[in-house]
Curated annotation (Swiss-Prot):
The gene is cheB3. The keyword Cell wall biogenesis/degradation does not apply. Its EC number is 3.1.1.61, 3.5.1.44. The active site is at residues 177, 203, 299. It comes from Geobacter metallireducens (strain ATCC 53774 / DSM 7210 / GS-15). Keywords: Chemotaxis, Cytoplasm, Hydrolase, Phosphoprotein. This is Protein-glutamate methylesterase/protein-glutamine glutaminase 3.
Amino acid sequence: MKKIKVLIVDDSAVVRQTMADILASDPHIEVMAPAADPFIAAERMREQVPDVITLDVEMPRMDGITFLKKIMSQHPIPVVMCSTLTESGSETAVKALEYGAVEIIQKPKLGTKQFLEESRVRICDAVKAASQARLRKITPRTGKEIAPKLSADVILEKPGSKAMIQTTEKVVVVGASTGGTEALRVFLEALPADSPPIVIVQHMPEGFTRAFAQRLDGICRITVKEAADNDTVMRGRALIAPGNRHTLLKRSGARYYVEIKDGPLVSRHRPSVDVLFRSAARYAGKNAVGVIMTGMGDDGASGMKEMRDAGAVTIAQDEATCIVFGMPNEAIKRGGADRVIPLDTIAREVLRLCG
């Protein structure tokens, strides 16, 4: 199997070395000579074309966004943005997704052994996902211990054959990963102000989901916000799961709400789509509509099958419109998807099902 060639671009020597060590620990990844700025990176790319670039957001001489635009206009290559958790850094990294970047990762930093191991898994997975991305024109607006692949059982036990509480109010749950930020923009922009309530898990690091939600809120007719514990799930509003926390759909009487909780990685992710979908199967049952969008891996596939078994209607994005046809494909293969449709028709279908 051909190794994924990665070019690291960061002005910090410490970050360059740390990233190189992390990526080199994966037998499927080959690290090219790193670059301290975009000008050196351009020289490296003339010598050897990388499969993936990890790009610092803030650098002297030329910032990451400017270099990203040049890459995408001249020689499109999958780019993973690497950012700190500052407010400006988060906003810029999210903006980069509109210019063609396919993933965001948090810069590695010192922490507990568990934190460092989870960071290693996330960074390597982001690069692998990026290497599979099918780039298209964006319209702006081993030997190592690996994280165990836990199921949603560690957060919420399997639902029974029926939802715990019978309801009539429809609720929509959505899961996405690589390429999902653009897919979610297309989906949410098409919804009217009084759309059904929506809860979303988009794989994204802690600190970036708020900026992502704010950007969507500024361009959509519905309200979009980062979910907080006990937020009411209501019409005309989409809640986006915060990074690094699991988000569950719950119901108390006539009210849907979200529970935000800690816990181990599930299907190698936190937040996990499987956790959200399982909670929807239990608490909404046949009144839920599940949507799984572009992304690498299989997070959400098992949960979507549980939703369908509980009577929910489930939708998978089709291969032609996915950046990475991993998660939807797994859901289809496991019998979790009722229907497979193009991205630009999902909003219309959701509205029809909830009408």
